[in-house]
């Protein structure tokens, strides 16, 4: 894969892209603003991932030496310039859609830069930032489809799922984070307590998920599909309690990403 594509972490950026498309499907809104919005959040997420890799250069030499910057595929300064250009493009796209969307993109851009520079290494605050940014993609889509309330509801579920997964990723990266004197949740409070918080968040998500059917937001199709996602989240929680090794956390993180994608599919199918 081209390193300039790889550094965007296209899989993660694609999830943001899908979030906006989901709001279009749910709201039965199909116009050029949706296309621009999906592209906007993809680029914004990719630029956030790039600036994050720029500031994480030293940590990634330990945790992820094959990433574009530590592997030497992209020079450090070029990564910075690349991210700033992408940020600018995403902001322009946001304002083309609407003033409100443009403001959201600017706020998210500021948050992503502050997160990468400082907040990521602060206990739990960094996790909250990533989860908030993920949730805001649905709000962003809701602004386009004129259904902000639903955007906030789905954004809340995305927030819970992302927050749990971010804690798992911190446990996976604990070795490199310790060497860089980061103050992540598992470093400050221990791996077991961090796992328990991730598990609790997973359980809360599973318990609340049927409410979207109960309150007639989505159809029975949603309930059938979300059960699959819930099973994956429960299984991930079980694995996390059993084994906190780097390899296990990496596997659990992947399982949870699959669970999130299935949950997103349930949103779309439940609205048809």
UniProtKB/Swiss-Prot annotation:
Location in or out of the cell: Cell membrane
> Which top EC class is given?
transferase
Q: Which domain of life is it from?
A: Archaea
Task: Choose one Gene Ontology CC annotation of this protein and give it.
Answer: plasma membrane
Functional note: Prenyltransferase that catalyzes the transfer of the geranylgeranyl moiety of geranylgeranyl diphosphate (GGPP) to the C2 hydroxyl of (S)-3-O-geranylgeranylglyceryl phosphate (GGGP). This reaction is the second ether-bond-formation step in the biosynthesis of archaeal membrane lipids.
Biological process (GO) annotations held by this record are: glycerophospholipid biosynthetic process
Question: By what name is this protein known?
Answer: Digeranylgeranylglyceryl phosphate synthase
What is the organism field in this record? Answer: Methanosphaera stadtmanae (strain ATCC 43021 / DSM 3091 / JCM 11832 / MCB-3)
Q: Which Pfam families match?
A: UbiA
Q: Which UniProt keywords apply?
A: Cell membrane, Lipid biosynthesis, Lipid metabolism, Magnesium, Membrane, Phospholipid biosynthesis, Phospholipid metabolism, Transferase, Transmembrane, Transmembrane helix
Pathway in which this enzyme or protein is active? Membrane lipid metabolism; glycerophospholipid metabolism
Respond yes or no to whether keyword Transmembrane is given for this record.
yes
Q: Which family does it belong to?
A: Belongs to the UbiA prenyltransferase family. DGGGP synthase subfamily.
């Amino acid at each position: 894969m081209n390193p300039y594509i790889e550094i965007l972490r296209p899989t993660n950026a694609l999830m943001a892209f899908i979030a906006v498309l989901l709001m279009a499907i749910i709201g039965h809104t199909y116009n050029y603003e949706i296309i621009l919005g999906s592209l906007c959040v993809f680029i914004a997420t990719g630029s956030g991932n790039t600036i994050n890799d720029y500031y994480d250069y030293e940590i990634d030499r330990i945790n992820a030496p094959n990433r574009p910057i530590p592997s030497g595929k992209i020079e450090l300064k070029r990564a910075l310039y690349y991210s700033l250009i992408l940020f600018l493009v995403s902001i322009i796209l946001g304002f083309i859609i609407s003033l409100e969307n443009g403001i959201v993109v600017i706020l998210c851009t500021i948050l992503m830069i502050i997160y990468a520079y400082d907040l990521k290494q602060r206990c739990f605050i960094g996790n909250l930032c990533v989860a908030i940014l993920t949730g805001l993609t649905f709000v962003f889509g809701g602004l386009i489809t004129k259904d902000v309330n639903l955007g906030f509801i789905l954004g809340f579920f995305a927030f819970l799922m992302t927050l749990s997964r971010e804690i798992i990723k911190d446990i996976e990266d604990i070795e490199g984070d310790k060497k860089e004197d980061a103050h992540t949740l598992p470093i400050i409070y221990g791996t077991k307590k961090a796992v328990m918080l991730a598990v609790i968040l997973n359980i809360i998500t599973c318990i609340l998920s049927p409410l979207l059917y109960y309150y007639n937001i989505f159809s029975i199709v949603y309930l059938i599909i979300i059960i699959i996602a819930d099973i994956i989240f429960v299984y991930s929680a079980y694995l996390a309690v059993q084994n906190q090794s780097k390899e296990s956390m990496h596997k659990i993180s992947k399982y949870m990403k699959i669970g999130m994608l299935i949950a997103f599919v349930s949103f779309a199918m439940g609205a048809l």
